[in-house]
Amino acid sequence: MKLEDIGVVMLSHGRRDKLEISLKSYEENGLTDMVGDNFIFFNEVANDDINMIENDYKSFEWGGHPVNCGIGWGMVKGIEDCGRKYVLFLENDFELAADKNDIYTQLELGYRNLEKGNVDIIKYRQVKDYIHTSNEAMHWAGKVDLTGHIDSEEGRQGCPEKNWWIGFAVEEKFGYNNSDICEKLDEEEETVLWRMPCKYANWSNNPFLCSKDWFLDLAAKVGFKEMGAPSNTRSPDFEEQIEAGGWWQKQDYRVGILPGLFKHQP
């Protein structure tokens, strides 16, 4: 089971404890052997970072910048160095929480639909991982009173349009019950790939798979053309830049939704 056209690109800055948990999960669950390239880009790279990769995680090659470029430029620099057509992007605190068969099934589903031009980007954070971390998901499910009973169910009405995709984290049959905003695109071994317009599926730096060229073109459109001074509080980073003025929601990109493979470390 090999997906040579996919390259893993990680972005890391500090928190080597979380990075090591993530790297260990990728190797133990077979991800690093399944893809064609493994690369990690360090913001503010340190000797300890380099030593850890070169001594303990030799399936990865590394690059880095001596200063903190910010998440946006870190993403761009890392993805530029990917040696494959498609990029599975991961920040250092996302742990793989799936077995080898599930990993292959979901990655291959995404890969083949990217190849066919059916979708532009696919989310790979486990949707169920949002239920306790996303305000939208918690509001969607409904407010719970002191006795543990739901006293209101807000659903789509209580959620901004750009976050309607979060319904997949809350409702088991969300895709089937909301065919006006999403469609069943493909299926493999009962794993379904859904497609939504980006109007209803906001951008996130959480794990995603897309074409390397598509991402770099997107980055250029939102201002990441040539790096000057490192990002700071007056220079918004990727997630903020792409959401500024509702830019992402005004595009015609198609977002793929899967059950997901990665969970965010607490």
Task: Set out the residue ranges of the language-model regions.
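Cell-envelope/extracellular polymer assembly enzymes that use nucleotide-activated donors
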Residues: 5-7, 37
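Short, well-formed alpha-helical segments that are part of the catalytic scaffolds
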Residues: 15-30
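Acidic metal-phosphate-binding loop of nucleotide-sugar-dependent transferases
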Residues: 16, 69, 94-96, 100
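C-terminal catalytic/acceptor-binding lobe
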Residues: 21, 170-266
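Acidic donor-binding segment of Leloir-type glycosyltransferases
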Residues: 26-63
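Glycine-rich, basic loop-to-helix element that forms the pyrophosphate-binding segment
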Residues: 66-81
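Short aromatic/hydrophobic "clamp" motif used to bind/position activated sugar donors
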Residues: 87
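Conserved donor-nucleotide/metal-binding helix-loop-beta segment in metal-dependent transferases, i.e.
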Residues: 98-128
